[in-house]
């Protein structure tokens, strides 16, 4: 415990040089081991006492996929460390060895989908939001839940309201394929007392409302919003939009 009496005795114990590239890591610590996401989708397990590298896993990207983006978050569940890669794959690694236990495709990177946020764990489910939804496809950005043991997808919630569904009319008569943005750039959070997941979404795309054939008074749900989701089925319990039509 660091307090007023001992804070002046803190000193550098060791230093670890990370991979080159953009890096915004949030390391995990478990049983004295640091699990660190690096640029280039490299995961390292480091002894917390002396900084010794215990194991390293490097994601193999398909030809043409991005390779230098940042990963912001990892998740730990039982004996597994899980990561959502930049090219849209969920991977579970053995926490002791770094060996891949399973992998599951979240989205097709060829359509522009990517990932930077990383999963959280709730009741044995890995919950993750995707980004890279600017190219206009038949499916928008989304949040998914996967079985933490097997990788099976359990539910999927789209972050753009579809025509004919609640909030769908806030995009006017735009077909679903032209409703872009509302990406999930950072990891969500979970409130166990409320039993709710919370995720933030980005702005609509294209950025300028007139380019969408809309005005700034058109809400384009569920962009620029905080979403509260039921972790059991992914249903939107409530939402709050911070800026309308931005």
Residue ranges of each PLM-predicted region?
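Repeat-blade elements of multi-bladed beta-propeller folds
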Residues: 20-42, 65-90, 114-137, 143, ...
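Extracytoplasmic/lumenal domain signature
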Residues: 2-18, 43-65, 77, 89-110, ...
């Amino acid at each position: 415990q660091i307090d007023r009496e001992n804070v002046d005795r803190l000193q550098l114990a060791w230093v670890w040089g990370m991979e080159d590239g953009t890096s915004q890591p949030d390391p995990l610590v478990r049983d004295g081991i640091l699990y660190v996401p690096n640029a280039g989708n490299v995961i390292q397990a480091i002894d917390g006492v002396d900084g010794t590298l215990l194991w390293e896993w490097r994601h193999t990207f398909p030809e043409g996929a991005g390779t230098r983006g940042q990963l912001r978050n990892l998740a730990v569940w039982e004996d597994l460390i899980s990561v959502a890669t930049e090219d849209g794959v969920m991977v579970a690694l053995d926490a002791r060895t770094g060996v891949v236990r399973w992998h599951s495709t979240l989205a097709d990177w060829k359509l522009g989908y990517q990932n930077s946020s990383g999963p959280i764990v709730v009741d044995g489910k890995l919950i993750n939001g995707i980004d890279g939804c600017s190219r206009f496809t038949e499916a928008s950005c989304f949040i998914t839940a996967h079985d933490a043991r097997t990788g099976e997808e359990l539910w999927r919630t789209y972050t753009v309201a579809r025509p004919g569904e609640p909030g769908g009319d806030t995009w006017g008569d735009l077909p679903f394929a032209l409703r872009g943005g509302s990406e999930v750039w950072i990891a969500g959070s979970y409130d166990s007392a409320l039993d709710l997941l919370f995720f933030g979404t980005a702005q609509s795309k294209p950025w300028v409302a007139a380019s969408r054939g809309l005005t700034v008074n058109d809400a384009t749900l569920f962009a620029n919003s905080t979403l509260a989701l039921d972790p059991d089925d992914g249903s939107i319990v409530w939402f709050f939009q911070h800026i309308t039509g931005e």
